[in-house]
UniProtKB/Swiss-Prot annotation:
Region of interest: Disordered: 1-23, 36-64, 289-309, 1158-1179, 1475-1505
Function as written in the Swiss-Prot or TrEMBL entry: Copper ion transmembrane transporter involved in the export of copper out of the cells, such as the efflux of hepatic copper into the bile.
One biological process term in Gene Ontology: copper ion transport
Subunit architecture: Monomer. Interacts with COMMD1/MURR1. Interacts with DCTN4, in a copper-dependent manner. Interacts with ATOX1. Interacts (via C-terminus) with ZBTB16/PLZF.
Protein name: Copper-transporting ATPase 2
Gene Ontology terms, MF aspect: ATP binding; ATP hydrolysis activity; copper ion binding; P-type divalent copper transporter activity; P-type monovalent copper transporter activity
Active site per database record: 1067
Transmembrane spans: 695-716, 738-757, 765-785, 805-825, 960-982, 1013-1034, 1363-1380, 1392-1411
Tissue specificity of this protein: The short isoform is expressed primarily in the liver with lower levels present in the intestine, hypothalamus and ovary. The long isoform is expressed in the liver.
Length: 1505
């Protein structure tokens, strides 16, 4: 390569930076360096100017250049770089970090440039005039035009005087937010100087919420060299302005990838050659591997002959001659490169280089670092630095051992690929990869390779690798000196094994035995340990991926498994390298809250097996000993009698199928023990059956008893004439005989379960209502039986009055209440059973061969699925476990988690959820969470915990009975004692009021009978029958009335709590909205005469008829309705691209149009509105090429979306609607807006609740923009958006902790935990079965006004329950003293039958009071509208407070203004505000692409249909 000639006199000499941009000039052509001084510049700031005061004389520079040309050993490549670039770089660093660009006046003639600046915050024409006046006064501004409607400014300026960034700063100083619009003109300096700004656009996939945007903007904005970051959630892209001499697009991409997202460089503005910093970077890479010693006597040569070492490289990715020149010019500049020749045809490069200055690896990295960044370099012999003519191999050194953790291996093919490729790398002696443990042990030469290079090589193969341990020990091999004559044995090196090639330089290495990596690691470090972290703040799958990917890159971390719903992370780590607290700190650095769970040991596997073939105790011992000796099994117990084995194991080490295989290997057969499905512990069928039988038995024998009792209460003038009073035998009347027979059956059959419950209660030292019931009935029965036996024994003339009528009445009413109680409990528990029914029963576990080819498929029960299994899921099947997609693409219905109807795109690496439905393609997934660790199991746990936290309605009565029962027993005992004392003191009192006893009975007996009678009367009349009926009867009547009004209320708990509700939380999709997408607008973008509306609808409807997407179904349904037909045209070549749109060819629509026109008749109002349309008379079939989708889909197909169309789409998207573009035959011809419309009564229901003093909150898994749009329509001020089911539960608990009673209104499976946790859960009748079962109240008619009606009815019912309780208490307060004989002195005394009658009367009074609820009438719609008339006002966006996920920071709209009523102003993310000045100035760029749809579940992206 020749040196460039001198420039002509008078022309300015190029700076070092400009020289590097000229492909015809090398590094050695620099004759003069420019230094920079500060001088007053535009707007009071300073800008650089050129001065030659500090330039060295030409002689000095010439001497320097001559030394380089001569290859003097005194001048190194680092000196070259520092000498050439230090002054320029030093100054450009200072200026660029302050946001200014280098001024090159005198180097390049002045010229003007045009640019566009986006401005946020303008509200009127006064703002426009202020900005125009301020900016036009700046030096270098030619003209400026500000548009209020477009929120932008068109500026023409002189780049050499002022930059767009300086203009932006001036506008921001006025109080507005300004940023350079994307895609506009850049300054001249940025096109020439590699040290100025460049822009790169990256496609970022995996963002699901605004927190993802904030996370990316915050982290990337803090990187050195990043000027501005703008992330679009809807477009799934990031536009980054950066300084290329500090950071490269590949670095930005890697940083975003490390955060858990998938980033791809779409396009960039890159320098055409290497800048000074790029060269410095390449120079720094030379220190990776130490160069061989340099012969100081040779000048830039390796051999006495002075010739360099030749190296042949294969270079892929070259496309034209410019690629060849790019490589030759830039690589030829590197120190140590003597010559380079690149061949485009053979895709090779021959380099003559000096190995003392540059290594083959550095050359490879230098070529691959050249723009555009798509060159791939490989060595023909597969080893770096082993060129064919290499004569000076490096000196050998002692080998080292390292252990890698490798994630992503799925089969033996992965193991062979890694071992085959890594073993060929230079310096690698041997490698052993272990699939089960996910590790690799490598023996390598540290003088020829580096652990980080090996780790990067594994990652280049598509796996994730991290370094666990390193060990470099000098005693592993002998010392080999160059002049030693001692053989390997004498030197201490082991003799190579048979078949093992000697290593270069006579180095021999130990063979790595194929054993567990844990044993290999034990020689260098301790065994890995496992810790568990509690993590909060995760909102979506990208948070999980973010944590897993970043932790796995940390040294010492073996594996990471994060569970989103459980909020836990399982980390396997090397305790020598890292500790749990450090891991928690790493998670905290990622922006999450993390704490080490000290006492948590993880969930061990539990397996119950049926074993056949056992004959004696020896078989049991053999099985148990075999299992207990197996690593990973913590417990094993085998029962010979039942042929069952109970095994506990660590799922990290061993799985259920492995245990089954172990048992079969020793000669027995094992299978999964049959278990009762749907969680038998939640089933109340046994209790329901027993209390039902108890009630029916008591009823059958109790009805005659009650009939006879009523008969005896009828007044009779001749009481002795009754047939029932006749004695069968002396002392035993017919009535008492019938009472005895009936009561005996009731006492011992119908009352059996009461005796069981009372016994259990007394055994635990408690006295509840069961004890009181049993005590009262038993004493009444025993007393009646005793006095009847005595009367018969004494042959009394009259049969005594007994209490045989008391037990049947008590048992009938109480058994009925218990039966109803357990029925309600069973209905509540059915929610859990239905949740469990979502779980698949079997999984298709596959075995993969090379290239992921399925070798074998096996149907495995869910209990036998192990972590790490590869599972195949076909279209329409359920995902059996949580996992990651290994192969295939599909759409998954995850509504059970998100509650949103839109399917989610799944591709390799995506997370899938157990219980969700696979909608389209067949996929292979890797199981990550199985058994109780799945997301579905966590939801079941949430619902179960919420339900268990609720006390049953009987708890209050039981608590009251805990005091009432002992009190009544004491009163009864005191009554007995007092009357005994009174009777013996004054027998006349007893004789006066006690029925005439038979002759021959002593006074003492009379006194004891009377005292005992009063005591029994107290127990009978004080029985809590009325208390037990007060609530259940009101509940039964109230729920019946509610059901008649379209409200299903489950039990007394919701009725009791609903009147206390102070906060109502509404879900969005399916609750506030209909949950079904509908077309809200069709906008034609072409002339009606060219393409009529009916033809557009016919074509679009035909195209969408082949789509299964919910939006496509909605569009098809609309087109059929508008065309008045059920048949559409013919669709061919249909192709659907998830996340973008569809393309197809449509024909045969002419007959549909002609038929529609014949059936249409007179023009409709819709036709009059759109204008007359020409009829279709062309009989020939026309074929249309159709594209339907989002902006990105149109861009991919070469169509331009104009600003007017973008504005129309943005207008709909800010309202929470999805805008779809339609192109026919390559022409953008229409836009269709699809929305999930708000229910008509939603706003009225919200207003009525507010007028009742109830706070209303909207909580949804949808994005915050859609949530805000819905909230403004219905009048809700507080919104929680982008929340998970666990977040909904947490929000309910948060409000409950503030002392508020919370009602949750929802319709989906994802709402069921919150419905169960809330004080009152209200489900929409059209919702899922799980939600309906988990809720306390169900709105059968799907009318939100019924939420108001349920609260209103609750208040009426609770008032009635309180009245019933007052009546019951009054009865007891009056009846107990009367029964005790307190009022005997005034002549008031109760006979035993009177006590029974009084008890019955109290029950009847309570029942009649409850029946009054049947007169309730629900307020009608007219009444609600009359109350709301003149008071309902719409909300603006600024009046709605939005919180995202578990974030308690408010996401309010901008300050209220007239602009709020017509436009939505994008929010400024908070994270970039923490970055440098430039990021703060540009963080408010208008993101028009935020296309959240009401129908999207967890993706802020327009869904293709």
């Amino acid at each position: 390569m020749e040196r460039a000639g001198d420039q002509a006199p008078g022309n300015p000499e190029p700076s070092s930076l400009a020289t590097l941009g000229d492909p015809q000039v090398t590094l050695l052509t620099v004759h003069k360096r420019w230094s920079f001084k500060r001088s007053p510049g535009t707007g009071g700031s300073s800008r650089p100017v050129i001065s030659e005061e500090e330039c060295p004389p030409p002689s000095e520079e010439g001497e320097f250049s001559q030394k380089v040309l001569n290859g003097s050993e005194e001048i190194s490549s680092k000196q070259i770089l520092s000498k050439l670039f230090q002054p320029a770089m030093k100054q450009s660093f200072a200026f660029d970090n302050n946001g200014y660009e280098d001024d090159l006046d005198g180097v390049c003639p002045s010229q003007t440039a045009a640019g566009t600046i986006s401005i946020v915050g303008m509200t009127c024409q006064s703002c426009v005039k202020s900005i125009e006046g301020r900016v036009s006064s700046l030096k270098g501004i030619v003209s400026i035009k500000v548009s209020l409607e477009q929120s932008s400014a068109e500026v023409r300026y002189v780049p050499s005087v002022v930059s767009l960034m300086q203009i932006c700063h001036q506008i921001e100083d006025m109080g507005f937010q300004a940023s350079v619009a994307e895609g506009k003109a850049t300054s001249w300096a940025s096109r020439v100087s590699p040290t100025s700004e460049a822009v790169v656009k990256l496609r970022v996939e995996g963002m699901t919420c605004q927190s993802c945007v904030s996370s990316i903007e915050g982290k990337i904005g803090k990187l050195q060299g990043v000027m501005r970051v703008r992330v679009s959630l809807s477009n799934q892209e990031a536009v980054i302005t950066y300084q290329p001499y500090l950071i490269q697009p590949q670095d930005l991409r890697d940083h975003i990838t490390d955060m858990g997202f998938e980033a791809v460089i779409k396009n960039k503005v890159a320098p055409v050659s290497l800048g000074p910093i790029d060269v410095r970077r390449l120079q720094s890479t030379l220190s990776v591997a130490p160069p061989a010693p340099v012969n100081q006597n040779d000048n830039n040569s390796e051999t006495p002959g002075g010739q360099g070492v030749p190296l042949h490289l294969r270079v892929d990715g070259m496309h034209c001659k410019s690629c060849v020149l790019n490589i030759e010019d830039n690589i030829g500049q590197l120190p140590g490169v003597q010559s380079i020749h690149v061949s485009l045809e053979s895709r090779t490069a021959r380099v003559q280089y000096n190995p003392s200055l540059v290594s083959p690896g550095a050359l490879r990295r230098a070529i691959e670092a050249l723009p555009p960044g798509n060159f791939k370099v490989s060595f023909p012999n597969g080893a770096e630095g082993s060129g064919p003519d290499s004569r000076t191999p490096p000196a050998p050194s002692a080998p080292c051992t390292m252990m890698l953790a490798i994630a992503g291996m799925t089969c033996k093919s992965c193991v062979q690929s890694i071992e085959g490729l890594i073993s060929q790398r230079v310096g690698v002696h041997q490698i052993s990869v272990f699939l089960a443990e996910g590790t690799a042990v490598v023996l390598y030469d540290p003088s020829r390779t580096h652990p980080e290079e090996l780790r990067a090589a594994v990652e280049d193969m598509g796996f994730e690798a991290s370094i666990l341990a390193e060990n470099c020990s000098s005693n592993q091999v002998g010392n080999h000196s160059a002049g030693s004559a001692v053989g390997p044995e004498a030197a201490g090196a082991p003799v190579p094994m048979q078949g093992e090639a000697p290593q270069p330089g006579g180095l021999h290495t130990n063979h790595i035995p194929h054993q567990s990596p844990k044993s290999l690691l034990a020689s260098t470090t301790v065994a890995p340990k496992k810790c568990f972290l509690q993590i909060s703040g995760m909102t979506c799958a990208s948070c999980v991926s973010n944590i897993e990917r970043n932790l796995q890159k940390e040294p010492g971390i073996l594996s990471v498994l994060v569970a989103l719903m459980a909020g836990k992370a399982e980390v396997k780590y090397n305790p020598e390298a890292i500790q749990p607290l450090e891991i928690a700190k790493l998670v905290q650095d990622l922006g999450f809250e993390a704490a080490v769970m000290e006492d948590y040991t993880g969930s061990d596997g539990d397996l119950e097996l049926m074993i056949t073939g056992m004959t004696c105790a020896s078989c049991v011992h053999n099985i148990e000993s075999k299992l207990r000796r197996t690593e990973g099994i913590t417990y094993a117990s085998v029962a010979l009698a039942t042929s069952k084995a109970h095994v506990k194991f660590d799922p990290e080490i061993i799985g259920p199928r492995d245990i089954v295989k172990l048992i079969e290997e020793i000669g027995f057969r094992a299978s999964l023990a049959q278990r009762i499905p749907n969680a038998h512990h939640l089933d109340h069928k046994v209790e329901i059956k027993q209390w039902k039988n108890s009630f029916l038995c008591s009823l059958v024998f109790g009805i005659p008893v009650m009939g006879l009792m009523i008969y005896m209460l009828i007044p009779s003038h001749e009481p002795q004439s009754s047939v029932l009073d006749h004695n069968v035998i002396p002392g035993l009347s017919i009535l008492n005989l019938i009472f005895f027979i009936l009561c005996t059956f009731v006492q011992f059959l119908g009352g059996w379960y009461f005796y069981v419950q009372a016994y259990k209660s007394l055994r635990h030292g408690m006295a509840n209502m069961d004890v009181l019931i049993v005590l009262a009935t038993s004493i009444a029965y025993v007393y009646s039986l005793v006095i009847l036996v005595v009367a018969v024994a004494e042959k009394a003339e009259r049969s005594p009055v007994t209490f045989f009528d008391t037990p049947p009445m008590l048992f009938v009413f109480i058994a009925l209440g218990r039966w109803l109680e357990h029925v309600v409990k069973s209905k509540t528990s059915e929610a859990l059973a239905r949740l469990m029914s979502l779980q698949a029963t079997e999984a298709t576990v596959v075995t993969l061969g090379e290239d992921n080819v399925i070798i074998r498929e096996e149907q495995v029960p869910m209990e036998l699925v192990q972590r790490g299994d590869i599972i195949k899921v076909v279209p329409g099947g359920k995902f059996p476990v949580d996992g990651k997609v290994l192969e295939g693409n599909t759409m998954a219905d995850e509504s059970l988690i998100t509650g949103e109807a839109m399917p989610v795109t799944k591709k390799p690496g995506s997370m899938v959820i157990a219980g969700s439905m696979n909608a389209h393609g067949s996929v292979l997934i890797t199981a990550t969470h199985v058994g109780n660790d799945t997301t579905l199991a966590q939801i079941v746990k949430l619902v179960e915990e919420a339900q268990m936290s609720k006390a049953p309605i009987q708890q209050l009565a039981d608590r009251f009975s805990g005091y009432f029962v002992p009190f009544i027993i004491i009163i009864s005992t005191v009554t007995l004692v007092v009357w005994i004392v009174i009777g013996f003191i004054d027998f006349g009192v007893v004789q006066k009021y006690f029925p005439a006893p038979s002759k021959g009975i002593s006074q003492a007996e009379v006194v004891l009978r009377f005292a005992f009678q009063t005591s029994i009367t107290v127990l009978c009349i004080a029985c809590p029958c009325s208390l037990g009926l007060a609530t259940p009867t009101a509940v039964m009547v109230g729920t019946g009335v509610a059901a008649q009004n379209g409200i299903l209320i489950k039990g007394g708990k919701p009725l009791e709590m609903a009147h206390k509700i102070k906060t109502v939380m509404f879900d969005k999709t399916g609750t506030i909205t209909h949950g079904v997408p509908k077309v809200s607008r069709v906008l034609l973008l072409v002339d009606l005469a060219t393409l009529p509306l009916r033809k557009v609808l016919a074509v679009v409807g035909t195209a969408e008829a082949s789509s299964e997407h919910p939006l496509g179904v909605a569009v098809t349904r609309y087109c059929k309705e508008e065309l008045g037909t059920e048949t559409l045209g013919c669709c061919m070549d249909f192709q659907a691209v998830p996340g973008c749109g569809i393309s197809c060819k449509v024909s045969s629509v002419e007959s549909i149009l002609a038929q529609g026109e014949r059936l249409q008749g007179p023009p409709t109002a819709h036709q009059n509105r759109v204008g007359s349309e020409p009829s279709e008379t062309d009989a020939a079939t026309q074929t249309f090429s159709v594209l339907i989708g989002n902006r990105e889909w149109m861009r991919r197909n070469g169509l331009t979306v104009t600003s007017d169309v973008r504005d129309a789409m943005t207008d709909h998207e800010t309202k929470g609607q999805t805008a779809i573009l339609v192109a026919i035959d390559g022409v953008l011809c229409g836009m269709i807006a699809v929305a999930d419309s708000v229910k008509q009564e939603a706003a009225l229901a919200v207003h009525t609740l507010k007028s009742m003093g109830v706070d209303v909150v909207l909580i949804t898994g949808d994005n915050r923009k859609t949530a805000r749009a819905i909230a403004t329509q219905v009048g809700i001020n507080k919104v929680f958006a982008e929340v998970l089911p666990s977040h909904k539960v947490a929000k309910v608990q948060e409000l409950q902790n503030q002392g508020k009673r919370v009602a949750m209104v929802g319709d989906g499976v994802n709402d069921s935990p919150a419905l169960a946790q809330a004080d009152v859960g209200i489900a929409i009748g059209t919702g899922t079965d799980v939600a309906i079962e988990a809720a306390d109240v169900v709105l059968i008619r799907n009318d939100l006004l019924d939420v108001v009606a349920s609260i209103h009815l609750s208040r009426r019912t609770v008032w009635r329950i309180r009245l019933n309780l007052v009546l019951a208490l009054i009865y007891n307060l009056i009846g107990i003293p009367v029964a005790a004989g307190v009022f005997i002195p005034i002549g008031v005394v109760l006979q035993p039958w009177m006590g029974s009658a009084a008890m019955a009367a109290s029950s009847v009074s309570v029942v009649l009071s409850s029946l009054q609820l049947k007169c309730y009438r629900k307020p009608d719609l007219a009444r609600y509208e009359a109350q709301a008339h003149g008071h309902m006002k719409p909300l603006s966006a600024s009046q709605v407070s939005v919180r995202v996920g578990m974030d308690d920071r408010r996401r309010d709209s901008p300050r209220a203004s007239a602009w709020d009523q017509v436009s939505y102003v994008s929010q400024v993310s908070l994270s970039p505000l923490k970055s440098d000045k430039l990021s703060r100035h540009s963080g408010a760029a208008d993101d028009r692409g935020d296309k959240w749809s009401l129908l999207l579940n967890d993706r802020d992206e327009e869904q293709g249909i």
